[in-house]
A protein has these predicted regions:
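A membrane-topology feature that recognizes alpha-helical transmembrane segments
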Residues: 1-144
Length: 144
């Protein structure tokens, strides 16, 4: 039995985003090799499909993901790896579903920030790994 494109996308996004989340929690970095490989796989998968997540959809998904995360990077709220991770996820999801992932990420990030603040008993001037929030949003988008 050949897996459906949706199943392959779900597995690929899950592996990519959860791996990035674990690495970010451990090292506070999202490796370029991971985001680059994920984006390359997303584009390669898109070349085999048409429609919403064909090659045009993959490129638009990356551009939308990058555009949504860029202000946070420019303001110093997120790291470059976080920006590249959402862009890579966008190659799998396309522009419409990466937008859903972004909103899921914002909600997940808010909850993670609150939990981090409560655990640390510090509510201001703190940082935390953001790839787990991106993973929450990406998983929300693929399982929605």
């Amino acid at each position: 039995m050949v897996p459906s494109p949706a199943m392959v996308t779900t597995v690929a996004v899950s592996i990519c985003s959860l791996t990035a989340a674990v690495i970010d929690l451990r090292t506070r970095r999202v490796p370029n090799g991971l985001t680059g490989a994920a984006a390359a796989i997303g584009v390669a998968m898109a070349l085999t499909r048409t429609g919403r997540v064909g090659i045009v959809g993959a490129v638009l998904g990356a551009v939308v993901g990058l555009t949504l995360m860029l202000p946070g990077y420019l303001w110093g709220a997120t790291g470059g790896g976080d920006v590249k991770l959402l862009a890579a996820v966008g190659t799998f999801l396309g522009p419409d579903r990466v937008l859903i992932a972004f909103f899921g990420m914002a909600i997940g990030g808010g909850l993670l920030a609150l939990a981090t603040a409560v655990v640390r008993r510090r509510f201001f001037n703190q940082t935390f790994a953001y790839a787990p929030a991106i993973a929450i949003g990406a998983l929300f988008a693929v399982f929605k």
